[in-house]
Design a protein with these regions (language model features):
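Outer-envelope beta-barrel architecture signal
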Residues: 48-54, 89-95, 148-154, 190-194, ...
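Transmembrane beta-strands of outer-membrane beta-barrel pores
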Residues: 56-64, 99-103, 158-162, 200-204, ...
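Residues that define the transmembrane beta-barrel architecture of outer-membrane proteins
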Residues: 64, 74-80, 132-138, 172-178, ...
Length: 499
């Protein structure tokens, strides 16, 4: 898909300057109504002009104390990223591909890839260590008009990950995540586009752990949430896998000129099983989740001034069902019952507003402000445990661009603050339970209980002037402060070319 866009883009004559295309593709408006273009049938009017970007760089992160112990306290990653958006005749094509190779330091209490997605059903130990990674991602889509009113679109994406360690304990995780999306839109009158889309997904992860040191063998835990684990299967059951599926749908509305009202509503359901291979494919647990997301907003522009706002909300819930087994015969455990022990809910509602002034594609300045309320709660039935957290978040971004000859200089500064809202938790179990797997829970609970803030900047500088190519170097930096004294620095340096 990316190669098709590159060839076709250079086969046709360019009607606007390259700098003008970059101005359009980097408008602050783009993040405000981005959810509308999750429907592939709406992508035909996302941008007026084609633009491709090739980017390679280095990503570095280091924390004095990690935000979550399971994510490690820093990483070093090299990456290559290719992005394309192309109008070709009546069709619109887009694609993205990237490759990441690196390592994460001091990963603790987690030996499973895709932590956020599969939590709480992780495989863990108390040793951990440096974990190496390779990530691959491919996405491509198209939209095409059927007559004057109807437009169809489709998009597919695939993510593959490999994570491993060369010293005990040695995880070797392989994941495959395949998603497909089909959409349709109908033009009401001249400008009003109403659309719908359906999504399907297939997921699998092989999660295996090797232990070669027979003298010192750590206990392997199969976590079930809030510091609990499936006690019966503790020990050396180190081969597991996850498999599952997802389905969803969305409704979208927008004007083709991206003025006036826009809206999007989406629902997604996911079902993933955890299976312990070393116990004759024992189905330990099932994790179900559903996500509701909605956005409504208003945009205006006169070609020189762009402004607008949105109201955005999301609810993400998880339901964990554990299977109960009888006495094993020949290492086969008969399933005798199942029960829903774990539930969690994340909620967010917020608003976003922006203003940007563009002067004939020669310079631009603007800002974006966000305000949101975020809540999180999780509960385990037996033993009964419950934690709640909430925060109010605000952030501000100031953005500027200036054209120098045929090149473009871009920069922004941004910062944010989160006020923790104390909840009346019965968290006495955090100090009473002395098991090894309580430490990451205590750490995460402390993180959410305190205020945190961040600040950063992005600068992009062109290297030379060319007619059809715009090479650039980009520097991104962010500083995070949390847990009263902990801090984290993130730095990304990249070299790229737009064409």
């Amino acid at each position: 898909m990316v190669m098709m866009a590159w060839v076709a883009n250079h086969a046709g004559a360019q009607k606007v300057s390259l700098a003008g295309k970059v101005f359009e593709h980097t408008l602050l408006r783009d993040g405000v109504n981005a959810s509308v273009f999750q429907n592939p049938a709406m992508q035909s009017f996302h941008y007026q002009h084609s633009l491709n970007t090739l980017n390679l760089g280095y990503d570095y992160r280091h924390a004095s104390t990690p935000k979550r112990l399971e994510r490690g306290d820093g990483h070093k990653q090299a990456f290559v990223d290719v992005d394309a958006y192309l109008h070709k005749g009546k069709a619109t094509l887009w694609g993205n591909a990237y490759y990441v190779n690196g390592s994460t330091r001091n990963v603790l209490y987690n030996e499973t890839t895709d932590l956020e997605q599969l939590y709480p059903y992780l495989m863990a130990d108390s040793v951990g260590g440096k974990t190496s990674q390779e990530y691959y991602y491919f996405m491509g889509g198209f939209s095409y008009p059927l007559g004057k009113k109807w437009t169809i679109g489709a998009e597919g994406e695939y993510t593959a990950k490999m994570e491993y360690r060369t010293r005990d304990p040695r995880p070797k995780n392989l994941t495959g995540d395949l998603r497909a999306k089909v959409g349709v839109s109908y033009l009401l009158g001249v400008l009003h586009s109403l659309g719908a889309a359906v999504t399907v997904r297939k997921y699998k992860q092989t999660n295996e752990l090797k232990l070669y040191n027979e003298v010192s063998v750590p206990t392997i835990y199969h976590l079930t949430g809030l510091g609990n684990d499936y006690y019966r299967f503790r020990g050396v059951n180190t081969s597991t896998y996850y498999k599952g599926y997802g389905v969803g749908g969305m409704l979208t509305y927008s004007q083709k000129d991206q003025r006036g009202w826009f809206a999007q509503a989406e629902y997604e359901y996911t079902n993933i099983d955890k299976i312990i291979s070393t116990l004759n494919e024992l189905p330990m647990a099932t994790l179900e989740s559903d996500r509701f997301h909605g956005t409504v907003g208003y945009l205006m522009n006169d070609g020189h001034q762009y402004y607008g706002a949105n109201l955005d909300g999301e609810i993400y819930r998880k339901f964990g069902t554990e299977n109960i087994f009888g006495t094993a015969q020949d290492n086969i455990y008969p399933q005798i019952a199942s029960a829903e022990f774990y539930t969690s809910a994340q909620s967010r509602i917020g608003m976003e507003a922006f203003y940007q002034s563009v002067y004939s594609n020669k310079s631009a300045w603007g800002g974006k402000w966000k305000l949101a309320y975020m809540g999180f709660s999780e509960k385990y039935q037996e033993p009964y445990r419950r934690l709640k957290h909430a925060a109010v978040m605000t952030s501000l971004l100031l953005d500027g661009k200036v054209k120098v000859g045929k090149c473009l200089l871009m920069a922004n500064v941004h910062g944010g603050y989160e006020w923790a809202i104390n909840k009346h938790n019965d968290d006495s179990f955090l100090s009473e339970d002395k098991s090894a797997m309580m430490r990451p829970l205590i750490h995460t609970n402390e993180y959410f209980a305190h205020d945190r803030w961040n600040m950063g900047a992005d600068v992009e500088v062109p290297l030379l002037v060319a007619c059809k190519f715009l090479p650039f170097v980009k520097l991104s930096w962010q500083y995070d402060y949390y847990l009263l004294t902990a801090h984290q620095n993130s730095l990304v340096v990249s070299l790229g070319i737009r064409f």
